[in-house]
């Protein structure tokens, strides 16, 4: 029996355990940085399978690493396991599938590969992908320094191995004015909400004229307490995105200019902060895409080389600039991510098929990269041969 057949057999043997873990995570969604129960479930699984589990970052208590050394030396294949859910929507991004797939891919791979083969299997539990960019902090703490390749799957509404992500920076824009009675002393006030609304209109309404590949969107989080009191404080949170980091940085500069203009025109003061690290565009690896395309076909998912017109952002993209990384998409639903329908489907038949296929695909790819040094060298060579403008991580 060849290796992939043994991996498929191992996935089938653990089918009930795989689905049960995903359902438990799906049933108790936890927000960014609060993934205590989910982290505990993944940790317990890997400890029970004789992985060595330790903290990955003191700053991120729900993160951890789980390691099994097959033999001395050799490459380290890292599976990332995302855990957090979305406010009000639960697992509408399918992190129950991502976390379960990463953990069980390592378990299956350990059961199939012979100890003594040079190399290490690792799971890195990564919190706060949805809000907080947890992997950026893990990068800063050196969590990926020993990884030779990083593998993760993502459920979606289509199949593709082509990794695309927009760079994103989050801006919190606060305006400070002066309170006054809105009817009795309107000229005594400085309306912070007026400033925020003026800024939002100036920055958002021309969005159809933004440079191709850039986006600006956000929400008003605070805007006053009563209609007869001129608000002295207003706050909005905005995402600025671009398909190239230079475009993103130019748009951020323009957004800042619009905020300062709005403050000047209303007599208010403005403060603009970035509450967390930004995320980058994705550095593709064509050799990893080739490996995964073959495995997609093996699981009955043909033509997985689609390039998307619209796509979002992820902190895994930052990882792709320091180590060869891939995040292929597996169709789990006919609905887009970040919707109630997708949250439902993440624990339905489509989501569970994506999960089982994902465990197989991750484990089979990891097996090849551990057992075929020449293949891993091709992956590294593709990483080193990035176009000149991609030689270093974007600022």
Descriptions of predicted regions:
Residues 3-119:
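Acidic/His- and Gly-rich active-site-bordering loop/insert found
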Residues 78-80, 176, 326-332:
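Non-cysteine beta-strand/loop elements that form the S-adenosyl-L-methionine
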Residues 4, 8, 28, 32, ...:
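Active-site oxyanion-binding pockets that recognize sulfate/phosphate
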Residues 62-68, 84-92, 96-97, 103-105, ...:
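Histidine/acidic-residue-rich, glycine-tolerant segments that coordinate divalent metal ions
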Residues 8, 19-22, 39-43, 102, ...:
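Hydrophobic face of alpha-helices
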Residues 197-395:
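Metal-dependent amide/peptide-bond hydrolase catalytic core
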Residues 77, 124, 149-151, 324-328:
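Hydrophobic/aromatic beta-strand patches that form the interior of the parallel beta-sheet core
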């Amino acid at each position: 029996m060849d290796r992939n057949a043994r991996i498929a057999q191992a996935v089938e043997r653990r089918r009930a355990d795989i689905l049960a873990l995903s359902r438990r995570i799906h049933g108790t969604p936890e927000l960014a940085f609060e993934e205590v129960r989910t982290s505990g479930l993944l940790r317990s699984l890997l400890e029970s399978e004789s992985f060595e589990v330790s903290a990955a970052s003191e700053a991120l208590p729900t993160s951890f690493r789980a390691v099994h050394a097959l033999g001395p030396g050799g490459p380290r294949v890292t599976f990332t396991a995302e855990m957090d859910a979305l406010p009000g929507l639960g697992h509408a991004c399918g992190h129950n599938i991502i976390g379960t797939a990463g953990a069980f891919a390592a378990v299956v791979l350990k059961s199939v590969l012979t100890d003594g083969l040079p190399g290490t299997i690792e799971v890195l539990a990564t919190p706060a992908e949805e809000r907080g960019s947890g992997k950026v902090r893990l990068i800063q703490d050196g969590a990926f320094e020993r990884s030779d390749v990083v593998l993760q799957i993502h459920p979606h509404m289509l199949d593709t191995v082509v990794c695309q992500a927009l760079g994103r920076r989050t801006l919190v824009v606060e305006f400070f004015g002066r309170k006054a009675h809105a009817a009795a002393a309107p000229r005594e006030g400085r309306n912070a909400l007026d400033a925020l609304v003026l800024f939002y209109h100036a920055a958002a309404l021309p969005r159809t004229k933004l440079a191709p590949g850039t986006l600006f969107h956000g929400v008003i989080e605070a805007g006053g307490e009563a209609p007869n009191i001129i608000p002295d404080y207003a706050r909005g949170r905005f995402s600025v995105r671009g398909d190239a980091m230079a475009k993103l940085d130019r748009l951020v500069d323009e957004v800042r200019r619009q905020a300062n203009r709005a403050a000047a025109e209303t007599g208010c003061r403005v403060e603009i902060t970035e509450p967390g690290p930004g995320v980058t565009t994705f550095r593709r690896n064509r050799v990893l895409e080739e490996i995964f395309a073959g495995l997609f076909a093996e699981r009955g998912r043909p033509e997985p080389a689609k390039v998307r017109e619209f796509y979002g952002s992820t902190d895994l993209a930052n990882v792709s600039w320091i180590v060869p990384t891939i995040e292929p998409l597996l169709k789990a639903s006919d609905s887009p991510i970040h919707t109630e329908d997708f949250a439902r489907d993440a624990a339905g038949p489509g989501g569970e098929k994506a999960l089982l296929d994902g465990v197989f695909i991750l484990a089979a790819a990891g097996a090849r990269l551990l057992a075929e040094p020449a293949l891993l060298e091709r992956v590294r060579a593709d990483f080193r041969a990035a176009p000149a403008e991609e030689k270093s991580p974007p600022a």
